[in-house]
């Protein structure tokens, strides 16, 4: 089920003054991507500017690698949540299973196109991804990034990630508590929030 975040029908993110404090969320929808969304997801990753692409892939990644990566995500059953505006995916959160680890663990990754960064889209994608991870029975989430990706480290800390430095990368681990009936906060679904 898509979580609608349309603020003002007919407006796009370009209609907002990006320099002023953002008081409303950009129009669009955060939803799980379908198999037919593969081309939109791939195009989103290919549109990332060089810095955003380096942050997302922890280093340099050429177009061929990025296109192949997007196809692997969908072929291997990765959960991909997207911020979709019109017919474009402009942000994405990925949940990759790590079956080799002893506890049910997911590796997570995020990307938001430059023009929409620092508007709360990453946080909303993170919230939705945590809900999906809980629903799939994961007890831990891991995120890795290069040590200079301050935005990702701040986002991970916001969700109580324990950060450490391993083999040249910053690694964050989030312990997921099981869902608790009536829990308030950003891990509740919109439907749950309506009845609390």
Walk through the language-model features, giving the residues of each.
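Conserved acetyl-CoA-binding loop-helix of GNAT-fold acetyltransferases
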Residues: 118-135, 140, 154-158
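A short beta-loop-alpha structural element at the N-terminal edge
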Residues: 28-40
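Conserved catalytic-core motifs of GNAT/GCN5-like acyltransferases
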Residues: 144, 157-177
